[in-house]
A protein has these predicted regions:
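Surface loop/turn motifs at the tips and blade-to-blade linkers of beta-strand repeat domains
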Residues: 36-41, 82-89, 141-147, 197-204, ...
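Structural signature of eukaryotic scaffold interfaces centered on beta-propeller domains
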Residues: 40-51, 89-109, 147-160, 206-213, ...
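Beta-strand-rich domains and repeat architectures in extracellular enzymes and scaffolds
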Residues: 34-63
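Blade-level signature of beta-propeller repeat domains, shared across WD40, Kelch, NHL, RCC1
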Residues: 252-279
Length: 323
């Protein structure tokens, strides 16, 4: 209990001082949760995204979306399969992410951003609605990345930006662009001129599914028997951890990845895994470089206090008693 309290206090200190934490894995372990076979006729499983207690599993060609209940990770079950009526070989679904944008206030789900086949350099934006037991999927926008090469996209945690993973024109990189308004059905963005931030990376291997948490991206790479997970600091492009999934028992092609709380769910073609940390805590702290830390003292309520304050204070990450 004492160690948990110390970790909580240190985490609060980092947040107060503008330092972002990355969830890394000191002693990574992989637990197989279940197998749910693909929907008949659906094609190959690609990425998935989680909203609430439901996981949405996407397939290549975007013909089907499976809705899978993940409220209890040891009782995962498929509830429904949506037939999209939008079968398109270009929409590979290599990367999918829910945004925080609702097309209409009473929609059951926010808009979902779906990467097309990498060489098409486009991302589709879909609206999913429900009438009774029936779901309807509507294409509301296509974003064209006119000067990029082999793109996938992820929505950042604020819901205001997209991170574009691209093999060019700056080598392999992530570029951050403002999510465009929905006024036009077709929008062109430039990773050269429209990016508000860009970081170059040195990750090797073919990119698969990815997900963003805080200022870090968790990106799967490789084909069957080659799977790795790269955790990259999006402020610098630094790969802060690389996990060999094959050594942990993952033999398939790593396609799907999403967080549910602190549980990182990874999938291949039908199998569900949980990546977790066998150490005391699964939260390690990674400070962003070149951040100025102001040495302010706080009371236990998180309020700044002066040097004359008497009582228990948090000073430079440590709990002390001033008399």
């Amino acid at each position: 209990m004492k160690k948990i309290f110390q970790i909580a206090l240190f985490s609060m200190f980092l947040l107060w001082n503008g330092i972002t934490m990355a969830q890394t894995f000191t002693n990574p372990k992989l637990e197989k949760l279940t197998t749910i076979k693909r929907t008949w006729g659906a094609g190959a499983q690609q990425d998935w995204a989680i909203y609430g207690d439901s996981l949405y599993r996407f397939y290549d060609k975007f013909a089907f979306i499976d809705i899978i209940n993940v409220k209890d990770l040891h009782n995962i079950k498929k509830e429904y399969s949506i037939f999209t009526l939008l079968n398109d070989v270009a929409v590979h679904c290599n990367d999918v992410d829910f945004s925080k944008i609702f097309y209409k206030n009473d929609d059951p789900l926010p808009l979902v951003y779906v990467s097309q086949r990498g060489d098409s350099c486009r991302t589709n934006v879909y609206r999913i609605t429900k009438t009774g037991p029936l779901y309807t999927v509507q294409l509301v926008q296509t974003i064209h990345f006119k000067d990029a090469e082999m793109t996938t996209t992820n929505v950042d945690e604020t819901g205001q930006y997209l991170w574009i993973y691209s093999n060019g024109p700056y080598g392999r990189s992530y570029s951050k662009v403002k999510i465009p308004a929905l006024d036009n059905k077709n929008v062109s963005l430039s990773v050269v001129h429209d990016a508000v931030k860009r970081v170059r990376i040195t990750i090797s291997g073919v990119g698969q599914g990815a997900t963003v948490k805080g200022e870090f991206i968790y990106h799967l790479h490789g084909y069957k028997n080659q799977g790795t997970l790269a955790i990259v600091d999006l402020s610098t492009g630094t790969e802060i951890q690389k996990i060999d999934l094959v050594n942990l028992g993952f033999k398939g092609e790593p396609e799907s990845i999403a967080f549910r709380g602190n549980d990182l769910l990874i999938g291949d073609h039908g199998n569900f895994y949980r990546l977790y940390d066998a150490a005391a805590t699964s939260i390690n702290t990674t400070a962003l470089p070149n951040r100025t830390i102001i040495n302010t003292d706080y009371n236990l309520a998180g309020q700044p206090v002066s040097k004359d304050y008497k009582g228990v204070v948090i000073c430079e990450g440590k709990k002390i008693v001033r008399k």
